[in-house]
């Protein structure tokens, strides 16, 4: 693996997608081979799994089913899109990766971080990011952002109550502590322009 694998993590409404859309042209202008992708999704099979995971009517989905579907989507995305790009020396910017599963299914759903981590170690063959940026934000602020975004389709996870979203953030903070060697916490409750500048600085300082 020759490229650089940067993952962007955060709760709902933390600004991950907007951030990545801004990072992409910046690194392109620097003549850096760069690719943006997302989880779950990024390729046809994983996008189909994303549709299943996000369907509002699938409220009966059991936590283990959810965790395994995310891991399956992750596996296919990794081997079909991420690894080939890394082998071609790309900087890969990925919206979510393993840490999402640890926070959402491992902690918030109560499956246990260690169990979910083992599922994903199997799925990814221990492929881990070069760097992870965690966008930290209070759940109330993130959900308020989502409510104001008329263009965003509300998914099954968005519909969870506030206690779930608080557990997600608690889980993320534990993940940050556990993997402090590769995760950098950035305050997402700031103007997007400043957030972009800060994240660019982190990536360039750590990797480039």
Curated annotation (Swiss-Prot):
GO cellular component: a single term: cytosol
EC number, UniProt record: 2.7.4.9
Source organism, top-level taxon: Bacteria
The keyword Transferase belongs to this UniProt entry's keyword annotation: yes
Keywords linked to the UniProt accession: ATP-binding, Kinase, Nucleotide biosynthesis, Nucleotide-binding, Transferase
UniProt cross-references to Gene3D superfamilies, sorted A to Z: P-loop containing nucleotide triphosphate hydrolases
Alphabetized GO MF terms: ATP binding; dTMP kinase activity
GO biological process, one term: dUDP biosynthetic process
Catalytic activity: dTMP + ATP = dTDP + ADP
Pfam families: Thymidylate_kin (PF02223)
Binding site for ATP: 10-17
HAMAP family: Thymidylate_kinase
Function: Phosphorylation of dTMP to form dTDP in both de novo and salvage pathways of dTTP synthesis.
Family: Belongs to the thymidylate kinase family.
Matches recorded under NCBIfam families: DTMP_kinase
Protein name (record): Thymidylate kinase
Organism: Bacillus anthracis
